[in-house]
Amino acid sequence: MRITVVGSINLDLVATAPQLPAPGETVTGATLARHPGGKGANQALAAEKLGAEVCLIGRVGNDAMAGEALALMEEMGVDLSGVEVDVAAPTGVALIAVDPSGENQIVVAAGANHGVTPEQLPQRIEGALIVQLELPVETVEAAVGRATGFVCANLAPARPVSE
């Protein structure tokens, strides 16, 4: 099955801490890890692991974080021909604090993800399409309008879309 994912690509910086900070509070973290992330990238990796032929459409910066964000997808066989490099914006980054129970706080600096436009999309998207709302809404709406098959929309982060 062919799946196209139109979505975000981030580098996740995950810090574990004994507790999450209250507003204005600083806590000392225990560990820091760097992982590929972004809802789109995560969806592409999951679909690839399940045996689908996956193409990811997104945008990264012209920086070292892009290489880290894309390396695992490339290794897993995700088609990255739809990923463009933005020379004016950095790769998206998610700063994630996690406590021992798994509760988390996340701040996303979208960076190049906000530069994905309808012009970057193919005129027809064959097979299944997966989208989410970490890209500009007009790009997500254009992708859905060009899809010829099943569409799976993860409406997160929640925000208004047209019908």
Located regions from the model:
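Beta-strand->loop->alpha-helix junctions that form or flank phosphate-binding loops
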Residues: 6, 31-34, 57-62, 80-91, ...
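Short, basic and Ser/Thr-rich N-terminal targeting/leader segments
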Residues: 50, 76, 89-92
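Glycine-rich phosphate/adenosyl-contacting loop at the front of the ribokinase-like
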Residues: 1-59, 64-68
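Short Asp/Glu-rich motifs
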Residues: 66-67, 92-93, 163
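Flexible domain-boundary/linker segments
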Residues: 20-23, 64, 90, 112, ...
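Short charge-dense sequence patches
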Residues: 15-26, 71, 91-97, 148
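Ribokinase/PfkB-type carbohydrate-kinase core domain
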Residues: 1-9, 71-85, 96-163
